[in-house]
C-alpha cells in the first residue's frame, strides 16, 4: 500500500501555495516535481495518488469502478477488488473512473479510518489567528437571490454577524426577484457602508443565473486585490458565524461547508455521479451527512455555498463562461467545468455550519409570507416566531399560575406578534362586532368581538399546526391525563379600542380550554385591558407581549375582558376542543 501519510489535501494546498512549507515526508516535493514533468499530466486524483510513495507491485488492477471498493480493517483501510478478491497496490483510473479514484483517495492510504477519523484534515492549514484586521485576505462575497425565498430578512440579519472584518469584504449582490427588492435595499441602506465595496444587480437588468455568477467570479478574477471568492445563495442558513474563517484556514483551492435541509438527507454536495452526470448516492453519503464520518471530502459536485481561491480563477479557471451549458443547469455546468480542469472540490463537515431552507411551497401573496412556512421550514419558523425562552417551560422554569388553573407562559417572539397584527391590519376586514356573524355555524355569536378569523387569511392549517406543536405539549403537562388534538373551530385575532370595542362582557368560552395570546405591550401600545376571572375574583392586568394565558373554557372560568382605555390592544384567541 501507499506508505506516505500525504494525501490529496496536502497536494492541493501545496499546488496553489508553492512558497508554503509542506515538506512532510517529501511527498509534496514529489508531487510538485511530477507536475513539472512536461511529458505527463499529473492534475488528476489518480496521478496524485501515483506520485505518492507507492511500492511498485507487478499486480496492477484494470477493473470497472464498481469492482473496486473500500476494505476497512483495524486501524487502516485498503482498496479491494471484489471481482478477483485481491487487495491491489496500484489503483489507476481514466476518464469517468477518476471520480471513483477521488472517492478512494478520501480514505486510502490511511487518510480516514473509523478508528482515527481524518488523519490529514488538520495538516497544511492557514491560521488567521494573530492577524491584524488589515492583514486578513480580501474576500468578494457573491450573494444570489434567484427565486422567492423565505426568511430573507433573517438571512441578512445573520450575514451581519459573520465573524470577519467587514472592511476586508466586498459584496456582489444579484437579485432576480422584485419581491425581495425592499429587503435588499433596506440592508444596503443600513449597513452597506460597512463593507469595502458593494455592487448590486437587480431584476431590472434581466440577468439570468449563469450570467450573474459568471460576472461575479470575473469581478474577483480581474481584481488584483481579491484573494477569495465566496458564493452564498440566499437560501443558505449560515449558523456558524466563523464559517468564512474556517474555510480560509482549510487552505484549499476550492472548499465548501456541508449544509443540509433540516431533518432530511438533502445537502449541498453529491458524493457520486451517475453515468449521465447526474446525482448518484455514494456509499458514504448518508454517513457524511449524518455526521458519522467527519472529515474533508473530495466530491464531484457542490452548490449554494463555497469558497474559491482567486489564484485558481486566474490559472486553471480562466474561462468566463464557467456556468454556461446548453444541456446542464448552471450549478451542474460549473462543477462539470471544474472537474474538466482537474480541480478538486472539497466539502468539509468538520464542524456544523448550518442548513438550507426549502423554497418549494413559498408563496408571496401575503404581507409576511414567512408566517406560512411552519410546514416547509419548521426549524426556521420556530427560530423566527417562537419565544426564545419557550423551551424552559417543559422544565418548569418559566410558567406562572396567576389564577387557579390559569397558566401563563411565553409562546411568541416579538416578531411573531408584530407580523400577525400587521397581517390582520393589512387584510383589514374586521367584523362589525354584532351578534349576527355569517362566518360561524348558525350565524349567531352570543359574545361578539371585533375580530378577523384565521381562515379569512388562509392561515387556519398553519395555526392548527402551531397549536399541535407548541400548545398541546404544555396542555398535557399542566392538565395531567388530558390529551388534545387541538380541534379548533374558532381561531381569531381580536382588536380592542376605546372608541370601537373597549371590553368584553362576562362569558364562558365554547371550549374545553382557551388560548389567549397578547400581541402587543401594555403602556407602550395601549392602556388598560386585561382579563378577570369572576369566580376567583382574580385579574391579570399587566399582560405581556408574546405570552399566552391558557385556562379552562367552560363551567369554572367565567371571565371578562377589562376595558382598554387608550391605544389599540390585540390578542390572538383559540377555542380548543369545543
Language-model-detected regions and their locations in the chain:
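Active-site-proximal specificity loops/subdomain of glycosyltransferases
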Residues: 177-227
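Catalytic core of non-heme Fe(II) oxygenases with the double-stranded beta-helix
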Residues: 464, 468-578
Amino acid at each position: 500500500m501507499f506508505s506516505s501519510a500525504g494525501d490529496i489535501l496536502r497536494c492541493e494546498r501545496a499546488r496553489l501555495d508553492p512558497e508554503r512549507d509542506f515538506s512532510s515526508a517529501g511527498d509534496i516535493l514529489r508531487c510538485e516535481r511530477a507536475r513539472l514533468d512536461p511529458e505527463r499530466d499529473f492534475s488528476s486524483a489518480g496521478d496524485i495518488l501515483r506520485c505518492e510513495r507507492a511500492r511498485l507491485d507487478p499486480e496492477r488492477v484494470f477493473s470497472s469502478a464498481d469492482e473496486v471498493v473500500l476494505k476497512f480493517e483495524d486501524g487502516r483501510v485498503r482498496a479491494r477488488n471484489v471481482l478477483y478478491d485481491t487487495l491491489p497496490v496500484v489503483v489507476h483510473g481514466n476518464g469517468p473512473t477518476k471520480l471513483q479514484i477521488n472517492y478512494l483517495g478520501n480514505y486510502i492510504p490511511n487518510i480516514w479510518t473509523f478508528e482515527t477519523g481524518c488523519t490529514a484534515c488538520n495538516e497544511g492549514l492557514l491560521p488567521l489567528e494573530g492577524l491584524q484586521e488589515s492583514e486578513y485576505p480580501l474576500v468578494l462575497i457573491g450573494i444570489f437571490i434567484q427565486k422567492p425565498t423565505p426568511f430573507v430578512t433573517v438571512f441578512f440579519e445573520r450575514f451581519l454577524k459573520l465573524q470577519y472584518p467587514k472592511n476586508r469584504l466586498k459584496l456582489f449582490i444579484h437579485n432576480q426577484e422584485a419581491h425581495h427588492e425592499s429587503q435588499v435595499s433596506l440592508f444596503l441602506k443600513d449597513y452597506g457602508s460597512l463593507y469595502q465595496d458593494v455592487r448590486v444587480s437587480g431584476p431590472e437588468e434581466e440577468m439570468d443565473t449563469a450570467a450573474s455568477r459568471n460576472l461575479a467570479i470575473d469581478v474577483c478574477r480581474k481584481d488584483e486585490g481579491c484573494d477569495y471568492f465566496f458564493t452564498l445563495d440566499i437560501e443558505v442558513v449560515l449558523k456558524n458565524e466563523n464559517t468564512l474563517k474556517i474555510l480560509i484556514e482549510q487552505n484549499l483551492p476550492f472548499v465548501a461547508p456541508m449544509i443540509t435541509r433540516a431533518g432530511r438527507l438533502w445537502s449541498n454536495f453529491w458524493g457520486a455521479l451517475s453515468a449521465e452526470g447526474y446525482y448518484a448516492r455514494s456509499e458514504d453519503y448518508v454517513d457524511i451527512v449524518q455526521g458519522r464520518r467527519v472529515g474533508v471530502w473530495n466530491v464531484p459536485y457542490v452548490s449554494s455555498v463555497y469558497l474559491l481561491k482567486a489564484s485558481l480563477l486566474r490559472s486553471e479557471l480562466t474561462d468566463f463562461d464557467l456556468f454556461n451549458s446548453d444541456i446542464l443547469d448552471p450549478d451542474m455546468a460549473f462543477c462539470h467545468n471544474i472537474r474538466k480542469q482537474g480541480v478538486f472540490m472539497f466539502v468539509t463537515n468538520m464542524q456544523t455550519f448550518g442548513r438550507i431552507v426549502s423554497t418549494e411551497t413559498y408563496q408571496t401573496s401575503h404581507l409576511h409570507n414567512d408566517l406560512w412556512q411552519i410546514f416547509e421550514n419548521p426549524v426556521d419558523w420556530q427560530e423566527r416566531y417562537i419565544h426564545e425562552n419557550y423551551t424552559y417551560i417543559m422544565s418548569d422554569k418559566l410558567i406562572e399560575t396567576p389564577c387557579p388553573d390559569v397558566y401563563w407562559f411565553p409562546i411568541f417572539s416579538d416578531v411573531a406578534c408584530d407580523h400577525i397584527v400587521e397581517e390582520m391590519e393589512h387584510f383589514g376586514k374586521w367584523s362589525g362586532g354584532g351578534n349576527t356573524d355569517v362566518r360561524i355555524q348558525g350565524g349567531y355569536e352570543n359574545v361578539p368581538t371585533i375580530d378577523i378569523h384565521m381562515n379569512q387569511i388562509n392561515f387556519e392549517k398553519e395555526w392548527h399546526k402551531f397549536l399541535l406543536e407548541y400548545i398541546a405539549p404544555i396542555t398535557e403537562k399542566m392538565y395531567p391525563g388530558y390529551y388534545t388534538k387541538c380541534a379548533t373551530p374558532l381561531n381569531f385575532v381580536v382588536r380592542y379600542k376605546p372608541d370601537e370595542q373597549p371590553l368584553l362582557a362576562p362569558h364562558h368560552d365554547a371550549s374545553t380550554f382557551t388560548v389567549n395570546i397578547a400581541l402587543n405591550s401594555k403602556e407602550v401600545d395601549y392602556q388598560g385591558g386585561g382579563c378577570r376571572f369572576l369566580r376567583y375574583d382574580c385579574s391579570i392586568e399587566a399582560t405581556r407581549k408574546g405570552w399566552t394565558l391558557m385556562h379552562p373554557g367552560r363551567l369554572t372560568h367565567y371571565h371578562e375582558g377589562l376595558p382598554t382605555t387608550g391605544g389599540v390592544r390585540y390578542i390572538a384567541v383559540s377555542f380548543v376542543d369545543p
